[in-house]
Amino acid sequence: MHFTCSHYTIKQTERSKLLKIKKEIAKSRLSIYAELSKLNILSLVLIATILGYYLGTSGLISWKRLFITLLGTALTASGSGALNHYLERETDKFMVRTKNRPLPAGLIKPAEVMNYGVLMVLAGIMILVIQVNMLTGFIALLTAFLYIVVYTPLKKITWLNTSIGSIPGALPILGGWTASSGSIDAMAWVLFAIMYLWQHPHFYSIAWICRGDYAEAKLKMLPVVEPDGNSTIRQIFWHLLLMIPITFLPFIQGALGLFYLIGAFMITSAFFVSALPLARNRSDKSALLLLKASVFYLPSLLLIIIIDKGVL
């Protein structure tokens, strides 16, 4: 009897160890797929979608429709991120920032990543087409196409990849708008313009910090093509200057009120000021300051709009 109990205990211990190993493997796989989905970019995409949906809504918000929109958008964006990983798997080996990603590190097979990416993109688009509307599904398809097929290869060809890549980066805000309204009007294009312009200082600051990595990988980012930084600074300030008057347009059009005008002016001005140190000293520390300001900008703008619409 004692032997049987001991034998049973040993079996239970083995099962516990096996279960623990399985859990660790599952956790590891989950973290791999999370990294393939580019959660940092996904979060910005979802913020932009919420912003567009909120502003495109007249009357009460349909929370169910918003949830479905975010689900379809998240699946499409995650799949696009995975396919970007797949296409850049060789390039990523040369950069310190990316050499430990799942594919260059050999943690997952390329075919598995490609299948995952395609499945996620198709699932996301189908959800948007069937459960939301055709226009929103088309915008998601266009976003994925431009990001995967156009922007990703252009990084090896021209420094204009940032400006072209900012188009799919700005489309999610239109997707949010069309999900709630079913159409695109002038205000939606204003939001698109804000998102398009915002991406330039955001991504140029990243490109400046990672210029050594990009040069090693032979990617045609502007700080690599023109290492003195003059062109990069001009591009940053050109787009920041354009942002200031464009952020006034929702107030001028009567879509948003005085609280928005004051708040948007303050955060856009702060965004502009955060770029001044980089213009003076061209340091990575100053570029990081601008990057942090750009990440702070979008959720701040969303909060200002929500508060403004709440008091209108």
Residue positions per predicted region:
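Multi-pass membrane catalytic core of lipid/isoprenoid biosynthesis enzymes
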Residues: 97-138, 227-251
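The first (N-terminal) embedded transmembrane alpha-helix
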Residues: 38-55, 167
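Hydrophobic alpha-helical transmembrane segments in multi-pass integral membrane proteins
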Residues: 174-184, 243-248, 298-312
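Interfacial loop-to-transmembrane junctions
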Residues: 231, 272-300
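Intramembrane alpha-helical segments
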Residues: 110-179
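Membrane-embedded alpha-helical segments that form the functional core of polytopic membrane enzymes
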Residues: 47-89, 97, 125, 138-149, ...
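Cytosolic, membrane-interface loops and tails of multi-pass inner-membrane proteins
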Residues: 14-28, 87-108, 204-232
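Transmembrane alpha-helical segments that form the membrane-embedded catalytic/substrate-channel core
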Residues: 75-83, 145-153, 194-211, 244, ...
